[in-house]
């Protein structure tokens, strides 16, 4: 097929049809970590926030952090990678599959990068002799790629294109029970397309992690062939209504490969979801924090690409009685004394008014049984050269922290993305100044945590020593969650 020279658009969200199906604004973005500031003097700052109920949040000049957020040189990244390529990372991994977060983590055994053919321990991986396609087929339990058109005919009753990203098309398909399922269709293997390592990483981590807060994976299928006419019709309809930045997929040859991920429809991405209150903003942050803490503990998980296109939101499934009780009959002053129905964690139940789902694990890192890990090697220089959005500064921060050691576990990368998330909630969702004590307190919490985990204040880069020092006691999503629960 004709080579596509399109530049990757990491983190640049695409347009959607309407608010009902504005989901997954950026499903194919490319995914990057820190160390520990003493937690002091926040009470005075919080009281100051409460006194200025009608004041608007100041616009942060995040892109002016020159010494910290300087664009990374790709050659520098290459040198760092070469410097560490012969080292065996001191990675902490689970000794066996994790069913709950209470199990302890033990020292590593054999560490295997499933998106590479080399075991980090120096021993060949079990599937290292397989070419990338057959390794992917092995993971999804297929002997060969299925004909694309045959797969579509066997699966769908109704289908509609609802979005796109640089490397994929997103469709909503209804199954036999009329339950909506999202298809993420990823052409891969050719120039200008997703690479095998990217697809392997996302598929493997999606299969490993089965927790609330991650989209339920129904099926992964590798297919081959020209683009089915049914999907082309939907592609054209979407183009007429919304435009498209992707090439029309009719140019794909009969040998073109695709990976199709079939997942639950989990809501609207945060960029397009309309938040109506500071309480809802707090709910988005707190639910995201809890999810990250859980998977950090169970799987040594780092998302490494948690921009607001990869956070899906929908209203929490609650009965009318629960909603009435939580939102109408109590105030924040009552939280510590009220007996909440059906929950032993009062604060969690009160804050859980929205349901959050994290998606897109292309750049993520996770551990599984017997020392096996999956991660992305961040080989694309474009990832570290983005401008005009705090998201791109986070990639550079992660690069400074990891120094090319992407296999290792740096949970503070999750804290970096939580700082980005609070920035988006405070400054990009256009909420009005709070007018009630409850709303003021919710915004005050976010601003307090924003200061607490500010990487400019908590990280000290020692350029001469080529090292990083941290002054913070918050070094992971788990430690931040513990702090939040103790504080509030």
Curated annotation (Swiss-Prot):
<keyword id="KW-0547">Nucleotide-binding</keyword>
<keyword id="KW-0723">Serine/threonine-protein kinase</keyword>
<comment type="subunit">
    <text>Interacts with pds5 and swi6.</text>
</comment>
<dbReference type="GO" id="GO:0005721">
    <property type="term" value="C:pericentric heterochromatin"/>
</dbReference>
<dbReference type="Pfam" id="PF12330">
    <property type="entry name" value="Haspin_kinase"/>
</dbReference>
<feature type="domain" description="Protein kinase">
    <location>
        <begin position="156"/>
        <end position="488"/>
    </location>
</feature>
<keyword id="KW-0131">Cell cycle</keyword>
<dbReference type="GO" id="GO:0035556">
    <property type="term" value="P:intracellular signal transduction"/>
</dbReference>
<feature type="active site" description="Proton acceptor">
    <location>
        <position position="305"/>
    </location>
</feature>
<dbReference type="GO" id="GO:1990758">
    <property type="term" value="P:mitotic sister chromatid biorientation"/>
</dbReference>
<dbReference type="GO" id="GO:0005829">
    <property type="term" value="C:cytosol"/>
</dbReference>
<keyword id="KW-0808">Transferase</keyword>
<keyword id="KW-0158">Chromosome</keyword>
<keyword id="KW-0418">Kinase</keyword>
<dbReference type="GO" id="GO:0005524">
    <property type="term" value="F:ATP binding"/>
</dbReference>
<dbReference type="GO" id="GO:0106310">
    <property type="term" value="F:protein serine kinase activity"/>
</dbReference>
<comment type="similarity">
    <text>Belongs to the protein kinase superfamily. Ser/Thr protein kinase family. Haspin subfamily.</text>
</comment>
<dbReference type="GO" id="GO:0005737">
    <property type="term" value="C:cytoplasm"/>
</dbReference>
<dbReference type="GO" id="GO:0051456">
    <property type="term" value="P:attachment of meiotic spindle microtubules to meiosis II kinetochore"/>
</dbReference>
<keyword id="KW-0963">Cytoplasm</keyword>
<keyword id="KW-0067">ATP-binding</keyword>
<feature type="binding site">
    <location>
        <begin position="162"/>
        <end position="170"/>
    </location>
    <ligand>
        <name>ATP</name>
    </ligand>
</feature>
<dbReference type="InterPro" id="IPR000719">
    <property type="entry name" value="Prot_kinase_dom"/>
</dbReference>
<dbReference type="InterPro" id="IPR011009">
    <property type="entry name" value="Kinase-like_dom_sf"/>
</dbReference>
<dbReference type="GO" id="GO:0140720">
    <property type="term" value="C:subtelomeric heterochromatin"/>
</dbReference>
<dbReference type="GO" id="GO:0031934">
    <property type="term" value="C:mating-type region heterochromatin"/>
</dbReference>
<comment type="function">
    <text>Serine/threonine haspin-like protein kinase involved in cell cycle regulation. Acts in chromosomal passenger complex (CPC) targeting to centromeres by phosphorylating histone H3 at 'Thr3' (H3T3ph).</text>
</comment>
<protein>
    <recommendedName>
        <fullName>Serine/threonine-protein kinase haspin homolog hrk1</fullName>
        <ecNumber>2.7.11.1</ecNumber>
    </recommendedName>
</protein>
<dbReference type="GO" id="GO:0005634">
    <property type="term" value="C:nucleus"/>
</dbReference>
<feature type="binding site">
    <location>
        <position position="184"/>
    </location>
    <ligand>
        <name>ATP</name>
    </ligand>
</feature>
<dbReference type="GO" id="GO:0072354">
    <property type="term" value="F:histone H3T3 kinase activity"/>
</dbReference>
<dbReference type="InterPro" id="IPR024604">
    <property type="entry name" value="GSG2_C"/>
</dbReference>
<dbReference type="GO" id="GO:0000278">
    <property type="term" value="P:mitotic cell cycle"/>
</dbReference>
